[in-house]
Amino acid sequence: AIEMAEKAAEILPPFDKLTDCNGNTMFSKSTPCQGAAYALLAHLCAWKAGGKYFAAEVDRNYDEKELWDMAEKACTKVIESPLYDLVATPEEVCASVLVGNSKEGVYETVMKDYYNEVGKRVYSLGTDYVGYPVRPEYGPGVVQDFTLRIFTTSVRKMYPGADTRKYAYFYDLDGMDAMDKSITGGFAYPYKERSVNITVTGTKKKFASFNSNRIWWRLADIYLLRAECRVHLGGDKIEGAIEDLNTIR
């Protein structure tokens, strides 16, 4: 698999050079390209390096440091490409990147606007914690019935001070926190995935599915993976790992 990913990275064109059979420019991040191949290569190398001691002893005859180095270099190929860029704010992550086909996306499966054809994104972890106001059939009190939930106080500890992620990832954090605790239970309202398909029957609206692509890899993921690679490589790579983490915080 690693050899095939290396070959793909060699022969596939960059994203901006992709064309269909008629020579038309491709715009979908679901089309395999050089950047996606490097992302795949990085993950394959990292998985094999990190899983060495889970393998049978007879299958451990390889240098994991070499694989961490290969993964780090593949990550760098994606990061240094001018075709991908981090968005500026956490709000853009929610409203653009997680919806799909953004400048930060590296590879994804197109599901937005086609959920009736390719399968509903109902069956995802999001349905276990997303309620009001993403799902119009729910009121704010339903959060207390969820198995997966988080206190607003915990959110503020996770994203302290001026960190705006707490306001992008959770709906009206301050306003809902001020609401009667008999309704909210003191819990926050996840709002990271908010692009949804709604069915309407008469005057009633109901959540049908998430209306977004399946994001396999985005640039922030690649920064995070490179940081992990650099930690395993150690030495003068540690400083670079810290820089990568600070870049995507």
Residue ranges and their predicted role:
Residues 23-25, 30, 59, 208, ...:
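Generic detector of short alpha-helix boundary/capping microenvironments
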Residues 1-12, 27-54, 64-79, 107-109, ...:
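Extended, hydrophobic/aromatic-rich amphipathic alpha-helical segments that build helical scaffolds
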Residues 21-23, 54-63:
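Intrinsically disordered, low-complexity Ser/Thr- and acidic-rich flexible linkers and loops
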Residues 50-58, 117-122:
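Short, solvent-exposed loop/turn and secondary-structure capping segments
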Residues 22-38, 92-104:
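Amphipathic alpha-helical surface "interface" segments used
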